[in-house]
Amino acid sequence: MPLTEIIAGAALGLALQILHEAIQRAKDRSLTTSCILDRLDSTILRITPLMAKVEKLNKESDESLRKVFEDLKHLLEKAVVLVEAYAELKRRNLLGKYRYKRRIKELEGSLKWMVDVDVKVNQWADIKDLMAKMSEMNTKLEKIMGQPIDCIISEDNTNMDIVERVDPSLEAKAGCSNSDSKPKIDIHLRWSKQSKDHGIRFVLN
C-alpha cells in the first residue's frame, strides 16, 4: 500500500511522509553517501503502518497519551531539518557530513525498535505500554536533536578557510557500516587577520 494512502488524514503520518520525502531529496543530492539515508527511510516506511494504526486509537485516549504523539510529531519535523541540512553540506565538508551522519544514525536507531512492535487494536494495555516506550524514545530523540553540530565564529577582518581530508573508504564505513568505528580526519585551519596569515592543523580519530 502506498505511504500516502496509509497516512491519509493522520497528523503523525503526515510528518512521517514529509520526512520520507526529505530523505529522497537528500539522497538525490548526496548519491555517494546515501546508505545511512536508505536505512532511515526503510525504518520510516516500516513503522508508518503501526503509527497510523495507533494514531486512530489515540483520538480516544487521554491527554497525556495525545501529548506523546504531539511531541513525536514535532521531533520528526526537526528530523526533516536535520536531513535537509545534511544534504546542503558541501562535498568537501567531510567533518560536517560525518557529524550529521552520526546524528542520523542515532535517529534511525531510536526509531527502529518500533519495527517489530505488534499492537492489537482491542488491547488497550498494549497501547498504553507502547505509549510509555514512545515517551522514552521522545526523550532520546530530543537529546539527539538538541546537540549542537556546527559552531561558527565570525570576527571583523577575519577570514577562515577549513580544509578537511579523510580516507573515502573510511567515510563510507562511517555511513554504511553497523560498527562504531570512526574515520581519521586530518583538519587544516587557515585564516588571515590584519594582513597576517595563521594556520593550525589537528587530527581527529
Curated annotation (Swiss-Prot):
The keyword Nucleus does not apply. It is a single-pass membrane protein. GO terms for cellular component: membrane. Keywords: Coiled coil, Hypersensitive response, Membrane, Plant defense, Transmembrane, Transmembrane helix. The keyword Membrane applies. The chain crosses the membrane at residues 7-23. GO terms for biological process: plant-type hypersensitive response; response to fungus. InterPro entries: Powdery_mildew-R_dom. Induction: Expressed in leaves after powdery mildew infection (e.g. Erysiphe cichoracearum UCSC1). Signal peptide: none annotated. Residues 1-153 form the RPW8 domain. Residues 70-92, 125-147 form a coiled coil. PROSITE patterns: RPW8. It is found in: Membrane. Pfam families: RPW8. Belongs to the plant RPW8 protein family. Probable disease resistance (R) protein. This is RPW8-like protein 2. It comes from Arabidopsis thaliana (Mouse-ear cress). The gene is HR2.
